[in-house]
Amino acid sequence: MNSEQVTLVGQVFESYVSEYHKNDILLILKERDEDAHYPLVVNAMTLFETNMEIGDYFTVFPNEVLTVFDSALRRSALAVLQSLPEPEGLSMKQNLHARISGLPVCPELVREHIPKTKDVGHFLSVTGTVIRTSLVKVLEFERDYMCNKCKYVFTVKADFEQYYTFSRPSSCPSSDTCDSSKFTCLSDLSASPARCRDYQEIKIQEQVQRLSVGSIPRSMKVILEDDLVDSCKSGDDLTIYGVVMQRWKPFQRDMRCEVEIVLKANYVQVNNEQSSGMVMDEDARKEFEDFWEHYKSDPFAGRNEILASLCPQVFGMYLVKLAVAMVLAGGIQRTDAAGTRVRGESHLLLVGDPGTGKSQFLKYAAKITPRSVLTTGIGSTSAGLTVTAVKDSGEWNLEAGALVLADAGLCCIDEFNSLKEHDRTSIHEAMEQQTISVAKAGLVCKLNTRTTILAATNPKGQYDPQESVSVNIALGSPLLSRFDLILVLLDTRNEDWDRIISSFILENKGYPSKSENLWSMEKMKTYFCLIRNLHPTLSDVSNQVLLRYYQMQRQSDSRNAARTTIRLLESLIRLAEAHARLMFRSTVTLEDAITVVSVMESSMQGGALLGGVNALHTSFPESPRAQYRRQCELILEKLELQSLLQEELRRLERLQNESDQCQPHSPEVEAAPGSCRNDPRDRPGLRTPTQQEQSCSWSPAESSGGDSPTGPGLSRPTSCNHKAEDGGGRGDCLAWADPTASPEIAQESTIVSPGLKTMEEKEDLKISNNGAQGKGKHGLQKRSQLLKPGRLPASGATDTSLRSRGSESTRARQAAVVSEAGRDDDQESGPRRLPRLLKEGSQSVCTTRVRTLPPTVPFPLSISPPGPGKKTGTPKRKRQKSAQVEAPGPEGTETMSAPVVKLAKFTFKQKSKLTHSPEGQGPMPPSASKVAVDSSKIPRQRTRREAGVPAAGPGQSTSTSGDRCSEQLQGQTKALSRQPPESHRPREEKEQGPERRVIQSELELGSQAGHSHPACKKDRKEGASCSNKSKVHAGTMARLANFSFTSPPESKSESLPPERKESRDRSHNPPATTAPVLGQQRQSFQLQQPPERVNLSTLSLFTLSELDDEALDFDWDEEMRKKP
């Protein structure tokens, strides 16, 4: 730059500072220390707008322009001082520095990566994280030399490019003709403080979250001088404005010159407080406020939409997503009057089998958190997690580890159990006190680690629910107690869960699509940064619930003494505040407290009220409001807070009424074909299906390849509710026996008018039996709910179903025994083999004993209202099956012939059986039973499997005989309908308990021969009584440990309906199987409850993925059968 340009730049900058920064200059002049260095921060955008020519000079000649700025600033300060009339208390400062910030956002000036060689000499803004800070040194930047010949004194400045070394002058620079080359250094005798400055080197690293996948973060050194020294520490996020320069060490002969690129800082901006790195404008805030205004009547539906967008590549796992979202939202850090700081960050530990999606949650959380570090336990040491002492250039420096780098952010540690024992103890202080104290290599300091830790680990071998978490994952109690939540994900062997998960994965692989209802990752990042600025306060109601729950945990007999300390109450408060943030609220309400207690109960820290739950199979609730109501009833009753419960129920009723008035919706109106009554789109205030829901939706063309027979006017429903989305759940620890879940089922129960016997009936009988048997163990539990008091289905349908179920169960055992004797094939597992044996046994008996009826003309199913007080509407899966079999197609013949092919493997030997025929009835059909027990005891057996079957109309039955029912059986059934069923009810109810023990003993005796056979184990498991004193083989416990069935109360409501309805319905509906007379009820089989040592509750706080008839909008068995 020439003198004119320097003068222009100086004048423009001096006038700019005098106009815009006069107050800042006055504050500097008031300071008492005249030798200190004072910065004046100038915004580059405002300066360049004043004069664009300065911007051009600044970009081309940054070092010269910065020197001119400092000189102009001193002149401006002197002018301001002189302009004051009474400059009392003001003094002129010589060490003033202009600090440039706020560069225009463009690739030429703002960088997120380390600069390269082409950037040397340019003024840039670089963002990074401090990983190392050196000690502050004293730098001599100039010296005075005197010529020995002419005594001329001149100044020599240190060369920055050669590590601030001084080069002795080669000749005298005086204007006189002096050729002397000998000089004397005057600074050796007394180095003036004015010729020295503070000097510090730091090392910054690229931010990992801003890099592409697989990139290794690079680092570079930054030179800090004067007032910039000690402006940052290890782990800080910085935006550094400076000039990119290169430097090398002095040349040596036969040595390579090593040049490095450094950044000479002009201004350092610490971004820890505003670590989000994004600007929160009013438009974004308004968008989220409108979102919550839309879900004002049902805020949990809005929260679930956010949770569905959290890690969408993982299917279901509602509870885990809720816990991760609460941990990311974070609590509020408090500092009391004494200075004690209580952490606000929550810690989460995911314990689960391999392949349960733990690492996916860690990766997603690290992506949406602006300041995050992702590491693994096997590759981390104590120093790598905390801080490392590194010797560089002959001195020791501290290099920050993962926890320090994640200060005010998130630290994800995968394979947490791989940490060595002495490395685990090093993070105790970091997790609780939020600091790290270091005394290494003579360096003693304390660093902040205000970070949220999200860890994942595998259990040590097979997870044993009988042992504590500390034993299962081999972690000490002091470390586990620092985690606010510990969720267990058990990969139970569940066929339906595996089918849905594989279908979801394969569908996404073949047809990748992006749902419009899911939030993008940028939107999620913006939302979580926004809600961290909220500071919700606890209400009196929430305080009462949290305090009462803490007291219940302390008084629990099975409490963990290391866990139920005051840390538990602090964890509850943090999580409640986090949930209030997630719900975009400024007050912690009762809803937040109830949700936090529910999540805590489902984690391994809780369990004092209802026991734990397998978080893997929790599903998104179809009705979030109904789930919250159920949680309120369960928790507040356990906590004995009846007044709060009544008040909250009244509030929920008021909200429900308001939403119904805004959008009237009748749940009793039958859904139109092709839709689902429980579809979330039809509910007021509920969200539309997300990508995971749409991935479950099956249309007839997609599922059956166009071969599915559909009747006129009926089409297969293609919607999918959230239970179906989240899969299997039949391997869950808790039984789905919550009574609050039954009204939904009762609404969908139907009564089909007894019409003509059509081909649809017969086809449907066969198909529905296959589907019912394919459901396996789950069907028993769901059917037991259907017959609770006040929820009995139609009498005729019940009678037919009872008789067919009884004969089916007896023949199922017959088929299993015969197949065990005639065939020793152990290649099929028990859970897959039992449904096939049940099906083939019943088919074999019917096909060998029953004549084939002539086909009749198909008629459409007619649905007539049964009378007042009855609700109409067919359940979803029943309507689907009816729609499938209305028009018999080629599949019908193939399905009928399939049992014949399977039957070729087995040989059934019919034996003579004991029969019992009441008065006025013909002989019992010869295919009634194969178990030769006392005939006086068998008719009175009526166990849960017979009593718990759902209503079976023309659209669903449990027999495979179909169109092979004989006319002789029809006559027997008509005669049977005249027999009153009440004659056997008193004895049946009295002797039900003793008879179950008789059956159990007989089954144990009959199965001793094939003790090791898988099918025999499965049969004994099916045939065991529900008594808690029963002994189950150890092999079967591995499959049934996660099931829990509760038998319904034995009352008259479970008995058969009155005689009039029974006889009227039976006169129109012939039995679908070789059913015996009513009085001769046969023994049936049911699954056994887990032993008492597994302390699991039958009530669930969260929606478990139970694939019942109403939850699934499609039948997996039917779909798999139709595919070639």
UniProtKB/Swiss-Prot annotation:
It catalyses: ATP + H2O = ADP + phosphate + H(+). Keywords: ATP-binding, Chromosome, DNA damage, DNA repair, DNA-binding, Helicase, Hydrolase, Nucleotide-binding, Nucleus, Phosphoprotein. Residues 688-707, 955-976 have a biased composition (Polar residues). SMART domains: AAA (SM00382), MCM (SM00350). Pfam families: MCM, MCM_lid, MCM_OB. SUPFAM superfamilies: Nucleic acid-binding proteins, P-loop containing nucleoside triphosphate hydrolases. It is an enzyme of class 3 (hydrolase). Component of the MCM8-MCM9 complex, which forms a hexamer composed of MCM8 and MCM9. Interacts with the DNA mismatch repair (MMR) complex composed at least of MSH2, MSH3, MSH6, PMS1 and MLH1. Interacts with MLH1; the interaction recruits MLH1 to chromatin. Interacts with MSH2; the interaction recruits MCM9 to chromatin. Interacts with MSH6. Interacts with the MRN complex composed of MRE11, RAD50 and NBN/NBS1; the interaction recruits the MRN complex to DNA damage sites. Interacts with RAD51; the interaction recruits RAD51 to DNA damage sites. Belongs to the MCM family. This is DNA helicase MCM9.
